[in-house]
Amino acid sequence: PCNIMSVWAGAGAFSDGKLSLSEEVGGNLVNYLSVDEVRTLIHYADSMYLDFGAPKEVFGLNDKKSDEIAYECSKYNIHLVRCPVRHMGTEYSYEVLKAMYDHLRKISGFTFLERTHADPIINQNGIVTGARLTDKDGNAQDISAHYVVAAPGRGGAEWLAGIAHEHDISTRNNEVDIGVRVEVPNSVMDNLTKHLYEAKMVYYSDTFENKVRTFCMNPGGIVSEEHYNPGFHNTFNQSIAVVNGHSYADEASHTENTNFAMLVSTSFTEPFNQPIEYGRYIAQLGNMLTGGGIMVQR
């Protein structure tokens, strides 16, 4: 199976292209920058997608309807995260990112080196000075640079953690999200998805206050099986089969169902420091029960 987390755009090129336009979603930048600075960066990134063909429509801007939905959620101790969403669709997400790729290739002095490892990052006296590049044939050369940006995505997350440890850069465990993908008839979720497209809801359980949240909602979408190969520098010991959800922009491709992920988020403390391996191990146990595939329950 293809490794969908690598090469140009990684998983982003093979997703249904939801752009979440809120500082409350998708990371912790507000821990390092002011809210205004983060919003400026989100707007800048969003404008890039628009320049390369993303649709202009944004869901979740009707404050009155959002207020009504949030009020209804509050009756059940559910918090609705306000988040405008621009949806490109599975069939157009790839095209938008390909347009970016084609644009960059035309820039003088800009070069893509596919199937080339940048490892190790060269560090001299505590200062990064470049990286060693190794192509698919095993030919290596050292490249000098004033700045090295390491952005390997999910496929290289464990590799990046190893680089940080190697250079004595402190890291912090992210939450570990374990859950299932739920599929229901559109009629169950239409009152949410027609206005918000994706309803991001958070609930804390009564007994242990476990954080439960919805994620990656796909109105009229499909559930797909995906395989994550061993990954960046064979980060993973074996391929794992997981589920994802997609939704197309073209209404002719819509189904009668809506799917979404329901995740339990857990923050571990010391001495635990392997959140990626933990999540992968849980997925591998599920694959073991099915002989290597995904598990379906009705």
Where are these regions (language model features)?
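Conserved catalytic/binding loops enriched for acidic/polar residues
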Residues: 33, 37, 43-51
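Compact, glycine/acidic-enriched structural inserts
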Residues: 55-56
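Residues forming the flavin
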Residues: 1-32, 59, 63-298
